[in-house]
Amino acid sequence: MFQSDREFLSVITQQITNFFDKNYWTYDKKEISPTTTIFELSFMIEGHTIKMSAQIDVKRRACILVGYLPICADPVYSYPLCQLIAKENAKKLFGAIKYDERDGEITYDYAYSVANGIDEEEFEKLFHIVLKMVLDECEILKHYCNGRLNKQETNEVIDKIQKLVNDIMR
């Protein structure tokens, strides 16, 4: 369908630009490299500022929608948080929650093929799904990000950590 990577990037970039402009959404467009363009947006939803990005990956002919959870994880709690993220990801047919241990950032990423261009209805539907996932996952993960576990969760974490420590110390 596309004669070159440059044509692919140009067409997909224009299609996303048209969609955002049609919805009167403010965005930043960054050309990260000759094969990657990223659109960044922010929305105020339910009292949270939700950041989103749409990333065009020419090499994979994909659009990656990324929703940034409005919470950061304290690295001290990464062990129980990552276990919960693994459980949540196992339930998902598409997309995944990701945790960046360098800065505590948590995202929900959804990649899909745009090899034949962007279908506006599909893009809109997926964009809203990612926004909803961010809000839903925020509610599920937030108490694990700062150690606000209930008694049962606390005991489970302590038990698992104790078993790990005992095994390592052998």
At which residue positions do the language-model features occur?
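Charge-rich, low-complexity N-terminal segments
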Residues: M1-K51
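Long, hydrophobic, amphipathic alpha-helical segments used as structural scaffolds
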Residues: E31, A96, C138-L149
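Hydrophobic residues embedded in beta-strands of well-ordered beta-sheets
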Residues: T37-F39, R61-C63, G104-I106
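Long, continuous compositionally biased terminal/linker segments
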Residues: S42-D74
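Short, internal acidic amphipathic alpha-helical interface segments
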Residues: G67-E105, D109
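Well-ordered alpha/beta subsegment
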Residues: F94, Y99-H128, N146
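Long, well-ordered alpha-helical scaffolding segments within enzyme catalytic domains
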Residues: E122-K142
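Short, highly charged C-terminal tails/helix-capping segments
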Residues: K142-R170
